[in-house]
Amino acid sequence: MTVQKFITYNSVDINGKTLSDEYKLELNVLEKSGNYLIHKDILRHQSSQRQGTISTKTRSEVRGGGRKPWRQKGTGRARAGSSRSPLWKGGGVIFGPKPRKIILKLNKKERKLALQTLLYNKRNNISIIDNLETNLDLPKTKTFYSLCKNCEINLDQKILIIVGEKTIPLKLATRNIKNVELILASNLNTFSLLKAKQILMTPLAVKDIKEIYCG
């Protein structure tokens, strides 16, 4: 059963000062089976990240082994037809992995519902920073560090920054910080959301989330 929930946030500037602007998110949230749906979507996301290129050689693909090692009878040893038998060192692999595609499908409505439910569950960890994409004047890591200090953001925890557009100063300022992930609102996924302990959004990202996932 889905329930409509409303979340309202005040934005802050890069100096940590609270602004008068209010941003509201209207989310459709699953009450009982929400965790199950989130888990399904995370499995779908993780399976899509797999390369699936692992490959082993069978006895017919291993080089060599065309000649019979010794005659069939009279030697006292066990009979052998090829030195590339899976029983031999350097032989082929029995039932080894081969390249394959692993695709787990989830309906678009279910994916949106899982994302909205997780956003609601993480509502207390979300902060909206006004014009984060454009207000970082210097593309330096220390600029972002000072922003985190002003906004009381703990850099020892996983931080997810959701933006409407990736600007070069913001990308350069955050790329050397191991706990920070920068993501477009259009590419938002449950896996990144679940890992994050603190979530920073921009007003443009809130607008995109409303249009893409809450419509």
Swiss-Prot record:
Region (Disordered): 48-85
Subcellular location(s) per record: Plastid, Chloroplast
Gene Ontology CC terms, in alphabetical order: chloroplast; ribonucleoprotein complex; ribosome
InterPro entries: Ribosomal_uL4, Ribosomal_uL4-like, Ribosomal_uL4_dom_sf
Chief subcellular location: plastid
Highest taxon, organism lineage: Eukaryota
Keywords noted in UniProt: Chloroplast, Plastid, Ribonucleoprotein, Ribosomal protein, RNA-binding, rRNA-binding
UniProt biased composition (Basic residues): 65-76
Gene Ontology biological process terms from the UniProt entry: translation
Molecular functions per Gene Ontology: rRNA binding; structural constituent of ribosome
Annotated Polar residues bias: 48-57
Pfam families: Ribosomal_L4
Function of the protein: Probably binds the 23S rRNA.
NCBIfam families with a match to the protein in the record: rplD_bact
HAMAP family per record: Ribosomal_uL4_B
Family label: Belongs to the universal ribosomal protein uL4 family.
Subunit structure, as described in the record: Part of the 50S ribosomal subunit.
Protein name: Large ribosomal subunit protein uL4c
Organism per entry: Trieres chinensis (Marine centric diatom)
Lineage: Eukaryota, Sar, Stramenopiles, Ochrophyta, Bacillariophyta
